[in-house]
């Protein structure tokens, strides 16, 4: 990412002066401190894991018939 696009506070502006997006939508998914697809994947795996623990507990622990 080029440093000339950054504002005085270090953040990227949302739009260029001519109205075009400052960062293309393709780069928004792959650049940054942590890619959004990686955060979403880790979150989805964590949700599936927690649900799996609940289902496992319902069949093996207290509450199983």
UniProtKB/Swiss-Prot annotation:
Membrane topology: Single-pass membrane protein
Region annotation (Disordered) ranges: 1-21
Highest taxon above the source species: Bacteria
Position of the signal peptide: none
Keyword Cell cycle appears in the UniProt entry: no
GO cellular component terms listed in the entry, alphabetical order: photosystem II reaction center; plasma membrane-derived thylakoid membrane
Keywords: Membrane, Photosynthesis, Photosystem II, Reaction center, Thylakoid, Transmembrane, Transmembrane helix
Residues passing through the membrane, by range: 36-56
GO biological process: photosynthesis
Compositional bias per record (Basic and acidic residues), positions renumbered to this chain: 1-18
Cell compartments where the protein resides: Cellular thylakoid membrane
Family label: Belongs to the PsbJ family.
Subunit structure: PSII is composed of 1 copy each of membrane proteins PsbA, PsbB, PsbC, PsbD, PsbE, PsbF, PsbH, PsbI, PsbJ, PsbK, PsbL, PsbM, PsbT, PsbX, PsbY, Psb30/Ycf12, peripheral proteins PsbO, CyanoQ (PsbQ), PsbU, PsbV and a large number of cofactors. It forms dimeric complexes.
Function: One of the components of the core complex of photosystem II (PSII). PSII is a light-driven water:plastoquinone oxidoreductase that uses light energy to abstract electrons from H(2)O, generating O(2) and a proton gradient subsequently used for ATP formation. It consists of a core antenna complex that captures photons, and an electron transfer chain that converts photonic excitation into a charge separation.
Protein name: Photosystem II reaction center protein J
Organism expressing this protein natively: Prochlorococcus marinus (strain SARG / CCMP1375 / SS120)
């Amino acid at each position: 990412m080029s440093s000339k696009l950054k504002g005085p506070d270090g953040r990227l502006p949302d739009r260029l002066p001519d109205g075009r997006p400052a960062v293309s939508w393709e780069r928004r998914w792959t650049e940054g401190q942590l890619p959004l697809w990686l955060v979403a994947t880790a979150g989805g795996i964590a949700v599936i894991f927690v649900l799996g623990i609940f289902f496992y507990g319902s069949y093996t622990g207290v509450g199983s018939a």
